[in-house]
């Protein structure tokens, strides 16, 4: 992970996002030592997420060298965490990762790496995350993630037209043409 991060940084990436997507599902924390090692060898912003369940986890990751912390499942289960984190550390370093999935003709929020469909509707959750203090949204369409046929443009347009904070597109890229 450290060598890949260094490679991306030296190759011109303008930001690096390291997500341990199985951490929440496996009920474990993100590897702090890896974050520390990566932060030492790159010169671009580093966003870290996965297994973040409370304010202490966010503080630990920022202290380890992360510039931003991404929260997903914990934010859905405890939305107040977004407010607490943004008040303590500033909204500029709080990224709410949202995994969206089409379910029964609606766009729903899923958690635990896409394994659990919640009752939250995607657009409502994005608006709520912003109102609670998220500085960015990392939007992943679970319908296109891993397929490599391009982003879910429809889902992204609906989210970006309903919030004013930056939305990072994730899930579906297979070639440069998808950008």
Q: Residue ranges of each PLM-predicted region?
A:
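Conserved, mostly hydrophobic/aromatic
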Residues: 8, 16, 48, 61, ...
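Glycine-rich, proline-tolerant flexible connector loops at the mouths of alpha/beta enzymes
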Residues: 13-34, 73, 138-150
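Catalytic cores of alpha/beta
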Residues: 39-69, 154-179
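Charged helix-capping and loop-helix junction motifs
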Residues: 1, 29-36, 79, 118-123, ...
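Short catalytic helix/loop segments, enriched in acidic residues and glycine
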Residues: 1-9
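Conserved anion-binding
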Residues: 62, 66-139, 143-145
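A structural motif
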Residues: 13-14, 43, 66, 134
């Amino acid at each position: 992970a450290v060598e890949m991060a260094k490679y991306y940084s030296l190759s011109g990436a303008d930001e690096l996002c390291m997500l341990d997507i199985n951490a929440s599902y496996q009920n474990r924390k993100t590897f702090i030592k890896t974050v520390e090692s990566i932060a030492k060898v790159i010169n671009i912003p580093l966003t870290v997420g996965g297994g973040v369940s409370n304010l202490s986890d966010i503080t630990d990751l920022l202290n380890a060298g992360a510039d931003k912390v991404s929260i997903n499942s914990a934010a859905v289960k405890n939305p107040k965490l977004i407010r607490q984190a943004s008040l303590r550390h500033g909204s500029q370093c709080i990224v709410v990762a949202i995994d969206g999935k089409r379910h029964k003709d609606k766009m729903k929020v899923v958690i635990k790496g896409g394994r659990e469909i919640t009752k939250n509707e995607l657009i409502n959750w994005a608006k709520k995350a912003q109102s609670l203090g998220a500085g960015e949204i990392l939007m992943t369409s679970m319908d296109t993630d891993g397929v490599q046929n391009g982003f879910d443009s429809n889902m992204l347009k609906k989210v970006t037209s309903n919030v004013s904070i930056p939305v990072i597109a994730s899930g579906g890229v297979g070639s440069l043409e998808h950008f």
